[in-house]
Design a protein with these regions (language model features):
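Flexible, solvent-exposed loop/hinge segments and secondary-structure transition points
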Residues: 2-187
Length: 187
């Protein structure tokens, strides 16, 4: 019996600690899915201007005619009726790129803003540069990323040395344009 006593004590202590951790998380967990964080608010103001913003939790109830797609994190609506999508896409970093794509009523891109990026400083983080993000404003339809100077209206130039991150931003914009085209925008 004495040879099993340390095992039993260790198992009991581990079980008690695990239960305490579970209880602590249950009492202190805050669901942030309906909250506009400071970083998201900054991105909203950059892309859509000053104003009041709210997250739309139920797209059908709001009258958009579709359910929230899996590739969209949040739909943010400004009090003037304009909307933006928060989209997390793959970049070079495993954490991805958290992007905000604001849309014009005609379905073109109003502005693109970076909520957060954890890519290589000086390379992947260059997708935050205003010159790169400005390429997307006014664009409609699916965009293609090119390494050289764009020759067509549906092309945007990648950031040199940050192809993965540039591809991620372009993917986020393409997702936003596609989802916006499916929305019933009558409200």
């Amino acid at each position: 019996m004495n040879q099993f006593k340390p095992t039993i004590v260790l198992t009991a202590v581990t079980t008690i600690v695990a239960l305490l951790l579970i209880a602590t998380r249950a009492f202190t967990y805050v669901d942030t899915s309906g909250i506009i964080t400071d970083k998201l608010m900054t991105a909203c103001v950059e892309a859509m201007g000053e104003g009041e913003f709210a997250i739309v939790p139920d797209w059908q109830a709001e009258g958009y005619g579709i359910d929230k797609p899996d590739n969209i994190e949040k739909l943010i609506k400004k009090t003037d009726g304009s909307i933006a999508f928060e989209i997390i896409v793959n970049g070079y970093s495993k954490n991805g790129l958290d992007m905000l794509v604001a849309m014009n009523p005609d379905g073109s891109v109003k502005a693109v803003s970076v909520v957060s990026v954890s890519d290589t400083p000086g390379l992947g983080t260059k997708v935050q540069d205003s010159d790169f993000l400005a390429q997307f404003s006014g664009k409609t339809g699916q965009l293609t990323l090119v390494k050289n100077q764009p020759k067509a209206d549906d092309e945007v130039q990648a950031v040199t040395g940050a192809t993965y991150s540039s591809t991620g931003v372009t993917e986020a914009v393409n997702i936003a344009v596609d989802v916006y085209s499916q929305l019933n925008i009558s409200n």
